[in-house]
């Protein structure tokens, strides 16, 4: 089986990592399995290590469940992982062979959650890489959609950019509507999953789940935040 590495380009002396920290506490939906490109079935790797992935169910106070893909390096993998876990890591994305953007948490550590409440927190900095889209939902809520670029580096100095689909609401949405491509942003929020229906080539209605960053706080800066 061939492997595909999440590596794009290399710099001799990589700059400091941009801010990208998250903590996820929830229930494992299924056992960890090798993380693969669903189109090619190639293994995904990071720092020379194969990745294993699963879905974590995180329940909001409202009762809505967010399903979050979590990937761990092989060195963290064990078949005896607790049913509920604490994951600390960073939010990453990649485009698979089907041109589908995959959003996942790359774990730096995992531990049993025991009686700890479900948690879904993310702090991230990056620059706006696409013009914002402001609109109103059918229920009249104002939202702005953003695409935030966050660059990280592996142990060999290879650049690994992630492009984070994000959404902000109401007053934040009005402020973000005026942002320009290239603006540096610091955001805090949570990773949410959203189900929508799409008609396939056969005319059938199929449900899809997408993940995005739901922003609770957003600040514009004139420099990168590390």
State what each model feature region is:
Residues 2-226:
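Single-stranded nucleic acid-binding surfaces, predominantly the OB-fold ssDNA-binding core
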């Amino acid at each position: 089986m061939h492997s595909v590495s999440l590596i794009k380009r290399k710099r001799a002396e990589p700059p400091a990592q941009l801010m990208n920290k998250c903590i996820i506490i929830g229930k494992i939906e299924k056992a960890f399995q090798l993380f693969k490109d669903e189109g090619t079935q190639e293994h995904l790797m990071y720092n020379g290590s194969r990745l294993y992935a699963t879905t974590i169910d995180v329940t909001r106070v409202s009762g809505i469940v967010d399903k979050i893909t979590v990937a761990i390096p092989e060195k963290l993998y064990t078949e005896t992982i607790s049913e509920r876990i604490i994951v600390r890591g960073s939010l990453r994305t990649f485009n698979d062979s089907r041109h589908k953007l995959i959003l996942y948490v790359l774990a730096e550590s995992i531990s049993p959650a025991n009686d700890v409440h479900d948690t879904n927190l993310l702090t991230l900095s990056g620059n706006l890489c696409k013009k914002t889209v402001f609109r109103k939902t059918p229920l009249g809520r104002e939202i702005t959609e953003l695409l935030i670029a966050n660059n990280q580096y592996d142990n060999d100095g290879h650049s690994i950019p992630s492009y984070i689909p994000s959404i902000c609401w109401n007053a934040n949405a009005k402020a973000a509507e005026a942002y320009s491509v290239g603006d540096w942003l610091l955001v805090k929020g949570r990773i949410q999953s959203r189900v929508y229906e799409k008609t396939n080539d056969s005319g059938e209605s199929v449900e899809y789940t997408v993940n995005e960053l739901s922003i609770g706080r957003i600040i514009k800066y004139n420099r990168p935040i590390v």
